[in-house]
Amino acid sequence: MKVIGSLKSAKIRDKDCRVVRRKGRIYVINKKNPRFKARQGY
């Protein structure tokens, strides 16, 4: 999982990427290709 400052570039990398909020953090998840996972950094 990558930790990046802005998720805008992460969510447009693949059409199956979804932006999810969990425990106050924002994540990008992708069930079809899990290597696109990312988390907002701050």
Swiss-Prot record:
Gene Ontology biological-process annotations: translation
Keyword terms: Ribonucleoprotein, Ribosomal protein
Pfam family, one: Ribosomal_L36
GO MF terms held by the record: structural constituent of ribosome
The keyword Ribonucleoprotein appears for this protein: yes
InterPro entries linked: Ribosomal_bL36, Ribosomal_bL36_sp, Ribosomal_L36_bact
SUPFAM superfamilies, per the entry: Ribosomal protein L36
Keyword Ribosomal protein: yes
A single Gene Ontology CC term: ribonucleoprotein complex
HAMAP family (UniProt xref): Ribosomal_bL36
Annotated PANTHER family: 50S RIBOSOMAL PROTEIN L36 2, LARGE RIBOSOMAL SUBUNIT PROTEIN BL36B
Similarity-based family: Belongs to the bacterial ribosomal protein bL36 family.
UniProt-recorded name of the protein: Large ribosomal subunit protein bL36
